[in-house]
């Protein structure tokens, strides 16, 4: 009989910096209110780093927890995939720096930049590598530090209140000839539409906008080094695209909403997730949200939610899990796995 190689998750981990900032902590700083933030986002608090803590510091903690839960040694890994939009340095990628901190030189290591969709894209890539037979054990990390790049003044409050710092990680391994009830990845669905890239982006620094330097004093004066978001456009597209991609993935596997035990959505805005659930007819108790505790940690939201769901007893082996994300690019995608 031919061997059917699939991928599965065997370990999850997450980490956030110790210092939490509640909405009340931001009221004076940003001239806002707890009520205003909660009504528009569902966020109650977020964690921000202090001092020289960098993204791979957070990622290391998440990776160590995922490895401990996986039951395999770090030396058994043969690839690291790191999804981030906030690397420690412009280059090389964070996967290389994390490799050093884990002390596992020589294995494949690379970054992907798909912003809030990064973890879903990473799942699909890891799945493909494992199904090819070239790799057996892959560490997939989503990690971000947003707090060092936010406009923490009343002018920037619409975006500053949204984002938190954190990291999530999963260890993915090969499994042979799994039965329907065994842990495994089923399918993924990925998309992008670059026509909307400037509706949610960071224009500077970059090689496209300055003749001699990637950033200038004029750019700083115009706040081009802070992220820009067209909130209304992002909301409408996120709801539409997340609903579409999840429907497509379920249909491709002959599954329905009723078959899925738990949904893990990217945590950008509670109103987005509520609307997607309403459109698809998902019972609220099947959706596990963490945005109230962490804010939007972009590529880290889904693996962080996965870890928290396990700890809360909401996610157990054998459960069918549907995931969907939407982010800058625009990029979006979904995955269906049996945990």
Language-model regions, residue ranges each:
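Condensing-enzyme catalytic core mediating Claisen C-C bond formation in acyl metabolism
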Residues: 1-51, 156-236, 244, 339
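Acidic-glycine-rich active-site phosphate/pyrophosphate-binding loop
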Residues: 30-39, 89-103, 140-149, 212-220, ...
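Claisen-condensing/thiolase-fold acyl-transfer catalytic domains that form or cleave C-C bonds
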Residues: 2, 56, 60-63, 67, ...
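Anion-binding (especially nucleotide phosphate/pyrophosphate-binding) glycine-rich loop
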Residues: 69, 73-105
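Flexible, glycine-rich active-site loops centered on histidine and acidic residues
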Residues: 131-167
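Short glycine-rich phosphate-binding loop at a beta-alpha junction
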Residues: 75-83, 257-266
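Buried hydrophobic positions in well-ordered alpha/beta secondary-structure cores of metabolic enzymes
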Residues: 9-11, 37, 66, 77-80, ...
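Short beta-strand segments
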Residues: 10-13, 83, 113, 138-144, ...
């Amino acid at each position: 009989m031919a061997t059917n190689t699939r991928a599965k998750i065997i370990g999850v981990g997450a980490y956030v910096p110790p210092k939490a900032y509640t909405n009340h902590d931001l009221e004076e700083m940003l001239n806002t209110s707890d009520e205003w933030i909660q009504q528009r986002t569902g966020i109650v608090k977020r964690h921000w780093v202090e001092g020289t803590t960098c993204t791979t510091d957070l990622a290391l903690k998440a990776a160590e927890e995922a490895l401990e839960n996986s039951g395999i040694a770090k030396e058994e890994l043969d690839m690291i995939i790191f999804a981030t939009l906030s690397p420690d340095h412009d280059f090389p990628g964070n996967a290389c720096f994390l490799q050093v901190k884990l002390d596992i030189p020589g294995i494949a290591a690379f970054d992907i930049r798909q912003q809030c969709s990064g973890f879903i894209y990473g799942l699909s890539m890891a799945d493909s590598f494992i199904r090819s037979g070239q790799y057996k054990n892959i560490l997939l990390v989503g990690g971000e530090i947003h707090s060092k790049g936010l406009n923490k003044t009343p002018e920037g409050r619409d975006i500053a209140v949204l984002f938190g710092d954190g990291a999530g990680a999963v260890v993915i391994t090969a499994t042979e000839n799994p039965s329907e009830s065994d842990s495994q990845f089923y399918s993924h669905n990925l998309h992008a539409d670059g026509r909307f890239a400037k509706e949610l982006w960071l224009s500077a620094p970059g090689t496209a906008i300055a003749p001699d330097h990637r950033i200038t004093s004029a750019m700083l004066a115009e706040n081009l080094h802070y992220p820009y978001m067209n909130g209304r456009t992002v909301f409408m597209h996120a709801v539409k695209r997340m609903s579409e991609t999840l429907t497509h993935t379920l249909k491709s596997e002959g599954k329905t909403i009723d078959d899925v035990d738990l949904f893990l959505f990217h945590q950008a805005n509670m109103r987005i997730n509520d609307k997607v659930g309403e459109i698809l007819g998902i019972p609220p108790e099947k959706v596990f949200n963490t945005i109230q505790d962490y804010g939007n940690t972009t590529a880290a939201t889904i693996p962080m939610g996965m870890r928290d769901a396990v700890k809360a007893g909401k996610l157990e082996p054998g459960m069918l899990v549907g995931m969907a994300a939407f982010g800058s690019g625009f990029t979006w995608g979904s995955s269906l796995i049996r945990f």
